[in-house]
A protein has these predicted regions:
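N-terminal cap/lid segment of alpha/beta-hydrolase-fold proteins
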Residues: 2-36
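C-terminal catalytic histidine-bearing segment of alpha/beta-hydrolase fold enzymes
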Residues: 193-196, 200-245
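Hydrolase active-site cap/lid region
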Residues: 118-160
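The feature captures the conserved acid-bearing segment of alpha/beta-hydrolase catalytic domains
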Residues: 140-142, 158-191
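Short beta-strand immediately N-terminal to the catalytic nucleophile in serine-hydrolase-like folds
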Residues: 106-108, 132
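Catalytic nucleophile-loop/oxyanion-hole region of alpha/beta-hydrolase
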Residues: 53-63, 74-103
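Short, surface-exposed "cap/lid" segments of acyl-processing enzymes
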Residues: 36-37, 42-65
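Gly/Ala-rich beta-loop-alpha elbow adjacent to hydrolase catalytic centers
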Residues: 108-112, 116
Length: 245
């Protein structure tokens, strides 16, 4: 899919205040934005259908904008290797292990939403997940031929053979999960909402929001109204955590 030069997917920068590596591969890096005094890190996990051609750079403007709102932000990169799906999750977990002495909120967009939900199940310092237009039901996405076969390319096979990577089939994380989808999204509604429908009866910490007059990129473009919606979602997670004690 081609986008005009001004589209958010074609934007990049500013780079983070600090950049660290969490492994030896070029994509095993984290950029940090904002003040380290904040006790909570907002971790951004980009989408792009797990394709090696789409990296974190289009989320740099969002990371910078969120830091200007007072959040301490970590923008992580991870390896995207067709047919090696566990590597992406392993990288996300390795990146998170490099963030010490902080609580984390995971924000994942599209394919990054799938990784965020999976990662939250594996760590103990996560207080919330915000999954925006997430690919949260791999088998449903496969049936929709999402991204022209992106799921099969990512997995290296059929989704039914990778049930341990399919969020809808797994128990939810212990932290709060906010599923956000958009009215004009090219990710089919059921691919995101099935996760909420599957788990809402078993957890009071799962919520679903459908944003009107918005598209797949609204929540990651800080130049529009999506930034306000995202900040509200982050603050909702923070306030609920305070309420839980």
């Amino acid at each position: 899919m081609d986008y005009p030069p001004e589209h958010i997917v074609n934007q990049s920068g500013p780079v983070g205040d600090l950049k660290i590596t969490y492994g030896g591969a070029p994509d095993q890096v984290i950029e940090f934005y904002g003040s380290t005094s904040n006790p909570t890190v907002l971790v951004l996990i980009h989408g792009g259908f797990w394709r090696p051609t789409i990296d974190r750079s289009h989320l740099q403007p969002l990371a910078f904008a969120l830091s200007a709102q007072g959040f301490y932000v970590a923008l992580i990169e991870y390896q995207r290797l067709p047919g090696r799906p566990y590597q992406s999750l392993d990288d996300v977990l390795a990146a998170l292990s490099a963030i010490v002495d902080k609580k984390v909120i995971l924000f994942g967009h599209s394919a990054g939403g799938q990784l965020a939900i999976l990662a939250a199940r594996k760590i103990t310092n996560c207080i919330g997940v915000i999954a925006a237009s997430p690919v949260a039901d791999l088998q449903a996405g496969e049936k929709e031929n999402l991204g022209d076969g992106a799921i099969n390319l990512y997995l290296g096979g059929s989704a039914q053979n990778f049930q341990d990577l399919d969020p809808v089939l797994l128990s939810p994380p212990s932290c709060r999960v906010e599923i956000m989808h958009t009215q004009k999204d090219f990710i089919p509604l059921n691919v995101a909402k099935n996760y909420y429908e599957q788990h809402k009866s078993n957890s009071s910490k799962i919520d679903f929001t459908l944003l009107a007059d918005s598209d797949h990129y609204t929540l990651i473009d800080p130049r529009g109204a999506g930034l306000v919606q995202l900040v509200k979602a982050v603050n909702k997670v923070l306030m609920n955590k305070i309420g839980e004690g």
